[in-house]
Each structure stands twice: as structure tokens, then as C-alpha cells.
């Protein structure tokens, strides 16, 4: 029996697998960074389990999260996506995915990779926290505030500080596995 972060106990196997295999693991791939930013934004106002359940649908609907392809989506394509039950059919969220794809390509152009830009907020090294209880883990940080502000300035949408902090946690910019969680130490060794 392993000890996990409380939020990953008594949940579906997909949720547990997400906690055990993905959450907090450093991501340096632009496509995966884009995927998580889109999924975190889609989750706004919903449960993460809803998004995990729709993840395959999102991958299919949004060209396997290839930002170059998503950036070329037409309004007609957006309208079609709004009829797709395999994703969250919220107009603002669907349209923001196209906007975010375009903005991420501009960031790639400026910084070399989208990942390098994102990782710049933590100087390229994951922040290692030592929270003992889930309730001690913050919803935002100075880094997420700064990144959120800059993303908004660059035209990204659905990137408030809470969403950005969740993105940072998911993609390993910050290791917020509680110290008693079996994933805390392994994630602390990752770069």
C-alpha cells in the first residue's frame, strides 16, 4: 500500500495513474506543454476528472495538440467542435485553444521553444516544495502570478494565476507532491 497525495485517493484508476505517472514530472516537450495548458484552461469551473475523461477526445479534436495545426483552425472548424460531445463545448474555451495555439507559436519564434519560455519562470529548475499536507499546498505563487501576467500580455486566454499554477504542478515546474507521498522523492530527483 502506497501513500499518495490526498487528492489522488479514492478516485478513478485514470486519476490515480495521472497522479502516479504524470503529475509533477518535468515536461520539456512543446506539444505536451501546450496540451496541459489547454486542458488546465478547459478545467476552469469543472473537475479535473471530467477533463481526464475527455482527454482522448481533446487529443482527437485538437490535432493531437499540435499548435501549428490548431492555429490554422477556421471558424467553421470551431463551430464543428462546439457540437463535439467528446470535449467541453464552451465557446470561449474552444476559441481560446486556437488563440493559445497562435500565441504559443509566437513564443516559440521568440524563445526557440515554448517549453524554454515556460521554464524560464523557474530559471529552468523545478521548485522543490516540502508541504506535509494537501491543504498547505497553495493555489498560486509569485511565479504563477508573473507567468500568468506575461501569458495574458502575449494574448493567451484562460491563464489566470490559479490555472497557471496548476499547469506548473502538472508539468513539473513545481513539485507539490506532499512529503509523505510516494512520488515526492522521485519527482524531486527529476529535472
Give the residues covered by each predicted segment.
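HhH-family (HhH-GPD) DNA N-glycosylase catalytic core used in base-excision repair
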Residues: 1-191
